[in-house]
Amino acid sequence: MITSQTPITVLGAGSYGTALAITFSRNGSPTHLWGHNPAHIAQMQTERQNYRFLPDVIFPEDLHLESNLAQAMEYSQDILIVVPSHAFGEILIKIKPHLKAHHRLIWATKGLERNTGRLLQTVVEEQLGTQYPLAVLSGPTFAKELAQGLPSAITLAANNEQFAREFQSRIHCSKGFRVYINSDMTGVQLGGAIKNVIAIGAGISDGMGFGANARTALITRGIAEITRLGISLGANTNTFMGMSGLGDLVLTCTDNQSRNRRFGLMLGKGLDAQMAMENIGQVVEGFYNTKEAYLLAQRQGVEMPITEQIYQMLFCGKSAQDVAISLLGRACKGE
């Protein structure tokens, strides 16, 4: 029987993986957090906090640290992957020898496969087969606020309704962590990935001093781009008005806790991409997602002007000023 006391294993000890592990443990699920760096895991075990990524948030008693992947997966039926999108394929290769028939896979990674633009669900099914229940967690949740126990809400989409309801009942907490079920895995994955690209655009706009009107226009036209792409892939339009669509987009475009927004701000103020990423010091998912989103839009024949212009800036040397001119100079059209 699945209960809130059933263990969960989280793979990925960065800021977001740690925050989710803290949340699950605090909500009553014995949680095992695995990281690829044994020294980092040992440090967290000693200090009972992730000083590198989430300083001053003390771990609950039922949060266990693990550097042995096989052992970490042995503890739990439910395996939650929280690694950067560029490392997603690699972690699938690592876990494959340790998967058992009873395992169920969830990921909170927001992105598309590097160099192909494929949905992560497609990558999972190709590498691991279609026999496992799969789910994705996505929504407007900054790691620090989540770890601090501040009120948050998130979307859970799964390919198995029973699995979705069981996992929802385990991690949902009425004290401040609300989990909404959505059956549209495609839409939930796309919203989480491409909002990072639009957030870079919002940051660039603010960095150039264009103001709140321009930022709001980018958010609004950004959700239109995401929705068009989603429809071309069979997603439900309503998904993009929910937590994993508009909710995550607004959060990421408007708050400086977002690395993607901060990255864009630096670009708008004249820094190059390499220097901006070095200043942030952590993975900027939107940098990689921009190329993949552009490739995916090209394959699908979907017009995504904001995404295309950010791609031109990051990978083709176009200036922020020329990007702005291109977007503002587009022909008149209906909304």
Curated annotation (Swiss-Prot):
Residues given in the record as sn-glycerol 3-phosphate binding sites: 110, 139, 141, 195, 248, 258-260
This protein's pathway: Membrane lipid metabolism; glycerophospholipid metabolism
GO molecular function, one term: NAD binding
UniProt-listed GO biological process terms: carbohydrate metabolic process; glycerol-3-phosphate biosynthetic process; glycerol-3-phosphate catabolic process; glycerol-3-phosphate metabolic process; glycerophospholipid biosynthetic process
Gene3D superfamilies: N-(1-d-carboxylethyl)-l-norvaline Dehydrogenase, domain 2, NAD(P)-binding Rossmann-like Domain
Keyword Cytoplasm: yes
Recorded catalytic activity of this chain's protein: sn-glycerol 3-phosphate + NAD(+) = dihydroxyacetone phosphate + NADH + H(+); sn-glycerol 3-phosphate + NADP(+) = dihydroxyacetone phosphate + NADPH + H(+)
Amino-acid positions noted as binding NADPH in the UniProt annotation, renumbered to this chain: 15-16, 36, 110, 143, 259, 283, 285
The keyword Cytoplasm is assigned to this record: yes
SUPFAM superfamilies named among the record's database cross-references: 6-phosphogluconate dehydrogenase C-terminal domain-like, NAD(P)-binding Rossmann-fold domains
Documented EC number(s): 1.1.1.94
Family listed: Belongs to the NAD-dependent glycerol-3-phosphate dehydrogenase family.
Name of this chain's protein: Glycerol-3-phosphate dehydrogenase [NAD(P)+]
Naturally occurring in which organism (per UniProt): Haemophilus influenzae (strain ATCC 51907 / DSM 11121 / KW20 / Rd)
Lineage, uppermost ranks: Bacteria, Pseudomonadati, Pseudomonadota, Gammaproteobacteria, Pasteurellales
Underlying gene: gpsA
